[in-house]
Design a protein with these regions (language model features):
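Acidic/His- and Gly-rich active-site-bordering loop/insert found
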Residues: 2-120
């Protein structure tokens, strides 16, 4: 996949899954969890992404509820991708796209901060 093909691939995936992502955002809104206690929220998202072919790795940065979800539409082993975007076993460049979402709620208020919204893009 070239970098010029990256945006349409991501955009199409988001468009095709828009309703499901909005449902996940609503679920998180309806089940507010404060920082570092987002067990239902993170499980909801990770389970969904896993059904979509993402590989889930828990305990990102030593945070129990944090996870990294990795996906590729090529034959590249994503476990061998280095931060510079080079595959260890070849010289092929691959795009690496990062997305960070916070979905912790405020104590006693819930999601007045809107942290559930990044889930729906």
């Amino acid at each position: 996949m070239t970098s010029t093909a990256t945006y349409p691939t991501i955009s199409n995936w988001l468009d095709n899954h828009r309703d499901e992502l909005i449902q996940k955002s609503c679920y998180i809104f309806e089940h507010p969890e404060t920082a570092y206690k987002e067990k239902l929220s993170s499980k909801c998202l990770a389970d969904y992404l896993e059904t979509q072919g993402f590989q889930i790795e828990w305990n990102t940065a030593g945070i129990e509820t944090a996870f990294t979800a990795a996906w590729t539409n090529s034959d590249i082993d994503i476990t061998k991708i280095q931060p510079a975007g080079k595959n260890v076993s070849s010289s092929n460049e691959v795009p690496i796209i990062g997305f960070l979402a916070e979905y912790d709620a405020l104590p006693e208020i819930g999601h007045a901060c809107g942290h559930n919204l990044p889930v729906s893009y």
